[in-house]
């Protein structure tokens, strides 16, 4: 049971980390170039 609990917590933390990293790169892209803002809308749809 302890293994399962750790696995779930680890996966949750990993998901939050990757989501934060994705947000960070997204924000960096927006700040980086003005013309790239239009391109950012496509992957989200």
Curated annotation (Swiss-Prot):
Keywords: Secreted. GRF is released by the hypothalamus and acts on the adenohypophyse to stimulate the secretion of growth hormone. InterPro entries: Glucagon_GIP_secretin_VIP, VIP/GHRH-like. Pfam families: Hormone_2. This is Somatoliberin. It comes from Cyprinus carpio (Common carp). GO terms for biological process: adenylate cyclase-activating G protein-coupled receptor signaling pathway; neuron projection development; neuropeptide signaling pathway; positive regulation of ERK1 and ERK2 cascade; regulation of protein localization. The lineage of its organism: Eukaryota, Metazoa, Chordata, Craniata, Vertebrata. The gene is ghrh. GO terms for cellular component: extracellular region; neuron projection; perikaryon.
């Amino acid at each position: 049971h302890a293994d399962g609990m750790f696995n779930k917590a680890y996966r949750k933390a990993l998901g939050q980390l990757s989501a934060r990293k994705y947000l960070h790169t997204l924000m960096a892209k927006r700040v980086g170039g003005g013309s790239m803002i239009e391109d950012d809308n496509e992957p989200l749809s």
